[in-house]
């Protein structure tokens, strides 16, 4: 309806079977003023595209529902892959894998590294395509020039959400901004959601999930406070403070460059 209004249309017509209850509910849920005309077994529906308070309310409600649903794979994944997992205990890829595997994550965790058979006793896989199952969430910690091809692999194998730890994007200048624009274009074309790039991850302390997809050195107590931070240094300090003060958190998101998932998206998710 919004696209039609932008092109100068003021009304829409549709024809459906009169007993197609599901389709009639779709029309009604639009919130647009509607007239129905039944003839024989068909029903003609005429929708006015003039916005009303009710149609605006319905549109905003649908947006909130869609945003919440799109972010769920970030916080409630059944399976997670760390792409760029490393054997070096000091590396971000190793710390991410260790955080996921050592904090009681209730899903399945996979390490992706084409040059290692095992990492910290965990079997590794050369690529997403070699995994025994699709994953919901991919945590990406590869060099910046490899990120775009990794996103292509994610889309091709059914990944639904990304956390891009890798830096070197809009925060470093014009070339980085251009690379980030290409990254965002790929993400949106494939219908994915992405936290980052240039972030340190996300966590969910829900006892049924216990997701720690960060390289922070702490996993906070479970609680009812949700937090996000653009600054990595501030985010790490907040997590350390929550541990020191014994303040429980529900979820934490390091949004980084906020190329896709924004604080506004998170507020809608947390509200719902």
Regions found by a protein language model. Give the residues of each.
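Catalytic-core regions of core metabolic enzymes
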Residues: 50-272
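Conserved acetyl-CoA-binding loop-helix of GNAT-fold acetyltransferases
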Residues: 1-5, 25-29
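Conserved GNAT acetyl-CoA-binding A-motif
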Residues: 3-16
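Signature of alpha-helical transmembrane segments in polytopic membrane proteins
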Residues: 21, 33, 50-51
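Conserved catalytic-core motifs of GNAT/GCN5-like acyltransferases
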Residues: 15, 31-47
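Conserved, charge-rich beta-strand/loop surface module that forms ligand/interface-binding patches
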Residues: 15-21, 60
